[in-house]
Amino acid sequence: MRILHVEDDEDTRTLVAFVLQGAGWDVVAVDSAKAAMETAANGAFDLYLLDNWIGGDTEHALCRGLRCLDPKTPILFYSGAAFPMDVETALACGAQAYLTKPCTPEALIEAIAKLTCG
């Protein structure tokens, strides 16, 4: 399985890639919405994993852009923003699920597996 992970925090990007690669998945990690759209346009992914805030801006425009580019691939927001409005907005933009940081590696793997394996 191939995952596009969009996260502006380098430590979080590295840790998440380590966890997901340990689960046997291929991870392409980028640090901006622009890089995410370019990467998604040039390759197929099984899941998009998005932080809610990238460089001081929300990723809702990215979520909508990914949804237009690829209407079927699941989108999972993985963010420290835990207000109900954050979750509602992400889902309204086309995401299938929202997971709040921090969580255990097992919870992240389980959330991804649920979206990609049924």
Regions found by a protein language model. Give the residues of each.
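Conserved acidic carboxylate
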Residues: 7
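Two-component/phosphorelay signaling modules centered on CheY-like receiver
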Residues: 10-28
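Acidic, metal-coordinating helix/loop segments flanking the phosphotransfer/catalytic sites
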Residues: 29-47, 88
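Short amphipathic alpha-helix used as the core "switch/output" element in two-component signaling
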Residues: 60-71
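C-terminal output helix
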Residues: 103-113
